[in-house]
Design a protein with these regions (language model features):
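Transmembrane helix-boundary elements of multi-pass transport/secretion proteins
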Residues: 4-15, 19-97, 111, 117, ...
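Alpha-helical transmembrane segments of multipass membrane proteins
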Residues: 23, 46, 133-138, 167-168, ...
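Transmembrane helix-loop junction
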Residues: 49-53, 89, 93, 102, ...
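Transmembrane alpha-helical interface segments in multi-pass membrane proteins
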Residues: 114-132, 182-193, 197
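Hydrophobic alpha-helical segments of integral membrane proteins
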Residues: 13-16, 20-24, 99, 206-227
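Transmembrane-helix boundary motif in ABC transporter permease subunits
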Residues: 162-175, 252
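Short helix-to-coil transition segments within interhelical loops
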Residues: 102-111
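Transmembrane helix segments
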Residues: 39, 46-55, 170-213, 217
Length: 258
């Protein structure tokens, strides 16, 4: 009687790393993701920075300029673009083309697929945020975040919260049209509550309360606090953690190969 030896399970890292590198190559080749996630917020910063109206110190903004206020919002813009437009389109596109179905026969599981997308977009977000902050500082004199620790905690939680929402959209959407529609709608709604069209500080009281509960609004307020030298309010950070848990768990639960 001959003994049979079972194949050892694939090392998780050996599966995830090539998957992340493959996703990163496809993201760069697609061009649309880098253009919208890196090029567009940088272009908006340059446009705003060259308009005198945005560089006037205002008593209504506690002595800050509109450009000072808009840099954290542009940071949120980066995260929202990736989370609501890039992530759902990529994953739903893979599902419709049968890529996910083929991956099902490999050691790759749904958690690794979602993790690879999350990592690629987090790296992209980090690059874009650093570029925005440096250009704002060097070209327009906008101060760098004064509370570095609080800023890092805020940006990481904001990125995770928004990316898990994007993964949830991808997992729950039956096709790319639905994913695009939901993602685009959420993008504009969330950017409104982030203060892109109307600074949060001058919103009516009701809208300010809604903004604090919205993921992007909580993110902008946390980043603004840290930029001004304060530790983000615990409620803002807790709000982001709740979004990570709820939508991250929902994305894994609803994930479909085909």
């Amino acid at each position: 009687m001959s003994a049979t030896t079972a194949n050892p399970p694939a090392n998780r890292g050996s599966v995830l790393i090539p998957l992340v590198l493959s996703e990163l190559r496809m993201f760069v080749r697609g061009k649309a993701g880098p253009i919208f996630a890196i090029g567009l917020p940088l272009a908006l910063l340059i446009v705003f920075g060259n308009i005198p109206f945005y560089n006037e110190h205002r008593s209504s903004l506690h002595g800050y300029t509109l450009l000072d206020v808009y840099v954290p919002i542009l940071t949120a813009f980066v995260l929202a673009t990736l989370a609501f437009n890039v992530v759902p389109a990529a994953l739903v596109g893979y599902r419709e083309k049968g890529v996910l179905r083929r991956l099902r026969t490999t050691p790759v599981g749904p958690v690794r697929v979602l993790a690879a997308q999350l990592l690629v977009n987090l790296v992209t977000a980090a690059v874009s945020v650093v570029i925005v902050l440096l250009v704002a500082r060097l070209a327009f004199g906008v101060a760098l975040p004064r509370q570095i620790g609080g800023y890092l905690v805020g940006i990481v939680l904001a990125a995770l919260a928004l990316m898990t929402i994007g993964l949830f959209i991808a997992a729950a959407s039956p096709n790319s049209k639905v994913a695009d529609g939901v993602g685009t709608t959420l993008f504009y709604v969330m950017m409104f509550f982030a203060g892109l069209f109307l600074p949060i500080g001058v919103m009516p009281s009701l809208l300010q309360h809604i903004s604090r509960a919205a993921p992007l609004g909580a993110a902008v307020q946390a980043l603004t606090d840290a930029t001004q030298g304060n530790w983000p309010h615990p409620v803002q950070l807790l709000t982001l953690v709740v979004y990570v848990i709820v939508f991250g768990g929902g994305a894994v639960r609803l994930f479909r190969w085909q």
